[in-house]
Amino acid sequence: MQPVGSAPRLAVLVAMVVLASSAACCRAQLASNFYAGKCGNTSVEVVIQVAVKARLVWDKRMVAGLLHLLFHDCFVQGCDASLLLDGPNTEKTAPQNSGIFGYDFIDDIKSELEAACPGVVSCADIIIAATRDAIALCGGPSYAVTLGRRDGMSSVSWMASDLPSPHVDIATAIGMFAKKGFNSFEMATLMGAHTVGVTHCSVIDDRLRNFNGTGKADPSMDPTYAWILTTFACPKGQAFDNIVYLDEPSSILIFDKSYFNQILSGRGVLAVDQALGMDPATAWMVQFFATTDFFPAMFAHSITKLAALEVKTGTAGEIRRNCRLTN
């Protein structure tokens, strides 16, 4: 057993080591000024930022959509916009991706950039830059992105099995992230994106009403919170599969550390959320992020690393004219 206080001290040490090494992570063939001078008088990143700002005015949920889209794209075949491709048996058709939204928004940005400089800006880069802007505009960290990704030319539904499910146990999740080069601390950090996350009642119905066939709510969930969700968000006989926010009501769609406090209160919405705070391998990480101010910097590091996962550069892939179709 660790001495009292050793876990927080270890967390600070881990965070400092990770952040110190982040600048060199995975950026060899990407560049912060990749599109400089390549789109006439148009600034690619300004176009994306303006579009994100305008969308968030009336659709703040888009921050959740973009984060979800980025993670599900990058975790399968790398950050190559393969998730955007239409067609039978593509990643988009996989059950794991049924809740993804924001495709139309990426299309809108792509259309604007194609009008300014055809065949220059990749769909993969649009996802990365738009997500960065949405995070910052919703109160999260501002961080630099490197660009120069190219778009993938294949998309296969079965490869979505690389994605962890909302019900995955922590040991399995750690293994899945490790295969992609992420340690458990980075995994817990990325799960902090659930501070602006959303799900649907159908995903958590078993936790609310029939946990492990007991006919009762998951005992790890705060009983009052379970009652609130079953009474107001997910009542029996609802006509629609309602949206449920993954963070507390006072912090919905605000990018902060409150997600971790929510878990400490037994109010993790997804099974994997609450498991993060209960498994000995990660419980101390939840405590650490909830009680310190390291989360923004660690998240900036971890999502930057994710955004550089298995990227296609140089002559690999292509620059799609339409994000839904290969050229």
Sequence positions of predicted segments:
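Catalytic cores of secreted/periplasmic or lumenal enzymes
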Residues: 2-327
